[in-house]
Amino acid sequence: MAETQADYTSLLEVLRDGAARAGMLERDARSALYADKDTGRHRALMEQRAQTLIDLESRTADLLNALPEAERRQTRSALRAFADGARTALDLGSVFYMSALLYRDNHKAGEPDKLQALVEDLETRLR
């Protein structure tokens, strides 16, 4: 049980780190665009954010094995969807698509994005 709890902790740390990095890159990109009027830096930061989502899928691959089957499938599916969307956004070169990767259509300011919600849900279920 202690080993499983340590695995959960490791997984949650990687997910929290990825969510924090994605959020930081998004805030920095927004600042580059609106405060600095630097569209090149904005694009570069959004590309880094997309790459962060792609990397998160591979960084968690082995750690997901510690989860019970239902949580493992659900989490793997969500991370794959984030990564696939990020790959598509990068392939298209669409900054708009990159900016929308983690948000529901009806997202409201101040609400957690889909990655943050996934982390919060896992934290609750793994207690």
Question: What do these predicted ranges mean?
Answer:
Residues 18, 22, 49-53, 57, ...:
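Alpha-helical transition-metal enzyme core signature, strongest for iron centers
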Residues 80-127:
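Amphipathic alpha-helical binding modules
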Residues 53-81:
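Short, solvent-exposed, charged loop/turn and helix-capping segments
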Residues 21, 29, 52, 59-63, ...:
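Terminal low-complexity, poorly structured segments
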Residues 9, 39-51, 73-81, 113-116:
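Short, charged, amphipathic alpha-helical segments
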Residues 5, 38, 65-76, 105-112:
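Short, structured coil/loop segments at alpha-helix boundaries
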Residues 1-48:
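Short terminal alpha-helical segments
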Residues 25-41, 60-70, 93-100, 126:
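Secondary-structure edge/capping motif, primarily at the C-terminal ends of alpha-helices
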